[in-house]
């Protein structure tokens, strides 16, 4: 499907503000068991949403690209990484917010020169992506990256 800009968007312009129900881990895992989708946004804080609602919300058609034109500003705000033209597809690298050991896109089809070909829920751990997206992961991942890098340098 995809998500496309209806009008030009300037660099750092707000593209999407996500929303849902915020729950602790126990509640979120129960909701997942009940068929809801969950996204971790902080220690013991999860955004929980219904797949049906998600499918009605065009922002959830935000496709992955290994060379995205949007990135994270904070827990729920996605902004333009650069100027975006009208009708240009809006893309994001899922490494910026997906943290899930079981998450896998086995064959990325983004077509980027920099395509990783396989996308996982642990891509945020890659040093090359940490440098490429510095400070534009979700804040939760930015903190995890900082902690991980401190442990490595110690």
Locate predicted features.
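C-terminal SET catalytic tail plus cysteine-rich post-SET Zn-binding segment of SAM-dependent SET-domain
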Residues: 64-154
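Catalytic cores of histone-lysine modification enzymes
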Residues: 1-73
């Amino acid at each position: 499907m995809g998500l496309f800009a209806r009008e030009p968007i300037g660099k750092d312009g707000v593209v999407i503000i996500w929303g849902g129900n915020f729950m602790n881990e126990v509640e979120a895992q129960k909701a997942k068991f009940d068929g809801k989708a969950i996204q971790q946004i902080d220690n013991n804080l999860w955004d929980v949403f219904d797949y049906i609602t998600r499918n009605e919300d065009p922002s959830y058609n935000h496709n992955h690209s290994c060379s995205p034109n949007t990135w994270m500003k904070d827990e729920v705000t996605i902004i333009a990484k650069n100027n975006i033209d009208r009708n240009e597809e809006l893309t994001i690298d899922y490494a910026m917010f997906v943290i899930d050991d079981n998450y896998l896109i086995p064959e990325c089809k983004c077509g980027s020169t920099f395509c990783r070909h396989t996308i996982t829920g642990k891509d945020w751990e890659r040093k090359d992506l940490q440098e490429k997206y510095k400070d534009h992961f979700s804040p939760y991942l930015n903190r995890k990256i900082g902690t991980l890098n401190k442990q490595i340098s110690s």
